[in-house]
Amino acid sequence: MPASISRSTYASMFGPTTGDRLRLGDTELVIEVERDLTTYGEEVKFGGGKVIRDGMGQSQRTRAEGAMDTVITNALIVDWTGIYKADVGLRDGRIAKIGKAGNPDTQPGVDIVIGPGTEIIAGEGRILTAGGMDAHIHFICPQQIEDSLHSGITTMLGGGTGPAHGTLATTCTPGPWHIGRMLQAADAFPINLAFAGKGNASLPAGLEEQVRAGASCLKLHEDWGTTPAAIDCCLSVADRMDVQVMIHTDTLNESGFVENTLAAIGGRTIHAFHTEGAGGGHAPDIIKVVGAANVIPSSTNPTMPYTANTVEEHLDMLMVCHHLDRSIPEDVAFAESRIRKETIAAEDILHDMGAFSVISSDSQAMGRVGEVITRTWQTAHKMKVQRGRLAEETGANDNQRVRRYIAKYTINPAIAHGLSRHIGSVEEGKRADLVLWQPAFFGAKPDLVLLGGMIVCAQMGDPNGSIPAQPYYSRPMFGAFGGALHASAVTFVSQAAAEDGVGERLRLQKGTLAVEGTRDIGKADMKLNVHRPSIEVNPETYEVRADGELLTCQPLAELPLAQRYFLY
């Protein structure tokens, strides 16, 4: 006989279902479950007296007969593709199927087979997201990787060689020798990594050798001279070799203004870093490029969101990051030209409109590597509080806003850098780089992080406890050690390097995957973040207008996902 139970009872047993709503952390963001791919009355759940037992929810099928390696049961997926409930089957380190798990011999509608060789991760009452991607990394110290991973980032892309002064200021791993050493160093870390070569040159040979050596992209930075000639040369190499170009434009406008830079780019695809300008770029109007079809605009997180402390802290950061001297007036003027509260305020609103497409960190070089995800959701919260619900929302929820913001650190950087066939979303066929969250801790502290289908870090209690008891904090797990590390994580390289056998040549232990499809894309390919307003910046007051509308908002004095989550 069918039985009926209350929604609250059902949610406590199997997690929320279609029509249920829940709050993300302590923010004002509320999501609603759009659909449920599991079957009422046939849900699978692990535990004493539960469903996943021999002959019940667990079949006799072997791995060779299609049983999964791992099943995440009853998870609430939050992704750019939607907000929905499902079981997720993992095989060979990838997402094999999203649907209904169980035993096809005893249950109807099963498309994810649980067998004797299947591990279970309980997703009931938890949120499942794709692992984040941080596409603006200065590899200044290896300890960044731990902080990033434990925040929910599973892919880091950038450049550097350690605390050399070139790396402290620019995201470049210059030259084949340094690229080779960094690719070898990547073998030590349980995270996907990709390295950017230096893109500043007026002749192509020095750039081509870096791409062949394994650089997955090239970085143009003003500290190396981002002249029109360097821009044109770098993009020409990128077009021939299918790698992305990132640009930090000329703050001092020495070699031209923003219009000259756009002319040098010539309609070719480019990823514009810290497009608001506090992190660097044509002062005061680099923000104009958000309206260009070929430019993928991104933010770095120190200006996200605009708060009471944002402007004050930036001057000191600039002096350190760009090797400036407070005793030199020109250095101070350089720093002050970049910090404009008007453009910082406009940046929040442009993100909410979907005009900025990506959020990243700028790690230790005016950015906080462990706060990409937290600051994304703080910004979404701030905009909900200050601007209200988005016009495109339907129902009493913030689903559209949540999908827009999660795309900024998952699918959009993956598309921008040619990695979206492998990472960036919770979709079948992609790598099982996944993050599980308790809703109350969403955006602050992940519960589990999986890389290539294996748990690499998790909230864990006292190892000497009879059960995992307090204190709980994020610790590395078995996927972060030994040969499992090399099987779980990958290093992304250029197609030219992959074809040249860079893995064998350098005796890399991690697998390598080639980037692809970076040149025939643009703003229109950025999921849920495609808006292209016409931007005007007043050169005297720095006021920003989008399609004639003044963009301004107040700084917040208090944020969610902050001190109450990080007492120790």
UniProtKB/Swiss-Prot annotation:
Its EC number is 3.5.1.5. It comes from Cereibacter sphaeroides (strain KD131 / KCTC 12085) (Rhodobacter sphaeroides). Pathway: Nitrogen metabolism; urea degradation; CO(2) and NH(3) from urea (urease route): step 1/1. The keyword Cell division does not apply. It is found in: Cytoplasm. Belongs to the metallo-dependent hydrolases superfamily. Urease alpha subunit family. This is Urease subunit alpha. Keywords: Cytoplasm, Hydrolase, Metal-binding, Nickel. Ni(2+) 1 binds at H136, H138, K219, D362. The active site is at H322 (proton donor). Binds 2 nickel ions per subunit. It holds the Pfam family Urease_alpha. Carboxylation allows a single lysine to coordinate two nickel ions. One of its GO terms (biological process) is urea catabolic process. GO terms for cellular component: cytoplasm. Disulfide bonds: none annotated. It catalyses: urea + 2 H2O + H(+) = hydrogencarbonate + 2 NH4(+). Ni(2+) 2 binds at K219, H248, H274. Its main location: cytoplasm. Its cofactor is Ni cation. Substrate binds at H221. The lineage of its organism: Bacteria, Pseudomonadati, Pseudomonadota, Alphaproteobacteria, Rhodobacterales. The modification N6-carboxylysine is found at K219.
